[in-house]
């Protein structure tokens, strides 16, 4: 109830706040020369794909390298926050809040940085344990009755890694004060990766029609099966809707959508009402729902592995 009350309050504040219409009016002339932000987006994409690929290779040493890469990515997020974001002073002096929920963004960044740091340490421990394993992973490209195939796994982990990079980046970009020289660059990377995530999710859905998903583990209770099914659908809906609502919000505000060095012009004219409605969805409602569902998804997977000892369920997607 507290969450619903907060979201309703945010919606009212957003609707009546004059500053809400200064969302992100990004102009072509504001971009820095050299397209550095496009190279950053490309490097994040390549690193994410390679990490997902190495994590699901046959050779155990290659999988260890993939786990180390994943740990390095977590440490990179934590280091970016601790050594860069904190130094900007934007957590103490952000862009003026549009809703009461904006005041929670510094705390969210702190939480995500600490989670990334702890996850990096945990992944290094996993890599050390993996290094003692000599088992060859016999994994086909297509899904099997009891586990996902290599294509599904690579898509799953690529999308997951990109989303974990998108979330803190999007939060930080939204608190950067207007007029900051590199504000646009953050939006270029954020929007580019958002378009890619949407494309990969659609590819994943198409692949599911060609290669049947494995059945849920038999050890799960009826309630757990229903929760897993609902969470799975909710994650797909949000992974599709968050990029789409972001594009619609940006278009209604009259700003371009960036994809590497290209700029996609708005498909329709400026609308205050459209900016409010779609901005509320993209910046508040869907992200906070994503935090809840994604957190439940991760905690549920860890519960099956560490508490219930349902190792088969965990290995459906993890090598």
Where are these regions (language model features)?
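N-terminal secretory/membrane targeting signals
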Residues: 1-24
């Amino acid at each position: 109830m507290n969450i619903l009350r907060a979201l309703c309050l945010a919606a009212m504040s957003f609707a009546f706040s004059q500053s809400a219409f200064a969302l992100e009016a990004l102009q072509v002339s504001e971009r820095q020369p050299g397209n550095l932000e496009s190279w950053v987006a490309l490097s994040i994409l390549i690193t994410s794909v390679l990490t997902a690929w190495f994590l699901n290779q046959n050779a155990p040493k290659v999988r260890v390298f993939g786990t180390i890469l994943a740990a390095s990515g977590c440490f990179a997020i934590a280091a970016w926050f601790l050594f860069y974001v904190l130094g900007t002073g934007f957590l103490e002096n952000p862009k003026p809040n549009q809703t009461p929920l904006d005041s929670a963004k510094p705390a969210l960044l702190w939480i995500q940085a600490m989670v990334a740091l702890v996850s990096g340490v945990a992944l290094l421990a996993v890599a050390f344990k993996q290094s003692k394993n000599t088992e060859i992973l016999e994994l086909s490209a297509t899904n099997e009755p009891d586990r996902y195939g290599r294509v599904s796994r690579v898509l799953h982990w690529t999308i997951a890694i990109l989303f974990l990079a998108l979330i803190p980046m999007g939060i930080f970009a939204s608190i950067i004060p207007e007029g900051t020289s590199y504000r646009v660059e953050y939006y270029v990377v954020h929007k580019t990766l958002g378009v890619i995530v949407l494309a990969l999710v659609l590819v994943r859905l198409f692949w599911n029609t060609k290669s049947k998903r494995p059945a849920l583990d038999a050890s799960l209770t009826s309630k757990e099966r229903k929760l897993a099914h609902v969470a799975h659908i909710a994650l797909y809906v949000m992974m599709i809707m968050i990029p789409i609502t972001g594009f619609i919000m940006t278009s209604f505000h009259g700003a371009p959508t960036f994809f590497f060095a290209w700029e996609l012009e708005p498909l329709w004219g400026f609308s205050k009402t459209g900016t409010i409605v779609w901005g509320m969805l993209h910046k508040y409602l869907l992200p906070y729902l994503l935090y809840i569902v994604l957190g439940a998804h991760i905690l549920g997977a860890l519960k099956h592995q560490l508490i219930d000892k349902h190792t088969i369920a965990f290995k459906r997607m993890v090598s």
